[in-house]
Amino acid sequence: MVILTLGTGLGGGWVYQGKLFDGYKGSGMEAGHVTYLPNGPLCGCGQRGCTETYFSASGFLNRYQEKTGNSLNSAEEFFDRNRKGETVASILLNEGIEALAQLCRGLIHTINPEKIVFTGGLVYSWDLFGNSLKERIQELIFPIFRTYTQILPGGNISGTLGAAALCMENQE
């Protein structure tokens, strides 16, 4: 199972055979820093075009300000503007969905998880992007993966999932 946390940034975790995969020295699954567009927006990591700059609270707010010259106070305000049908907010959300779908495609084709579970504060707005995201992922992945790969919202439970995985691992 892959867990992607959609919040201020975009984080990730991978639980494989009951163990949390955290890479060499605990730095695995920095999924938000996988490049989506090489010449894209500057990321907080210093690189350009990271997926996080397209789908995260900070990414949405920064890109909204770049496009409109107006700053928003929160991701909730960004999603409220989407609910009201604001064109710029809608375009940015759709670009974010594409970036996130491409990231998921890469993860599915690389590690073949049974599930990708989305957690974090942005999942509270799943009704605005969840179906589009699932449909786009289905379009992008190999047909065999479509038959069993589940794309699910998990709510704002990323910390709980991470702690549980660490506890399971430490018991062994």
Could you describe each region identified by the protein language model?
Residues 1-54:
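Glycine-rich phosphate-binding loop of actin/hexokinase-like ATP-binding domains
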Residues 35-172:
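ATP-binding/phosphotransfer module of carbohydrate and carboxylate kinases, centering on a glycine-rich
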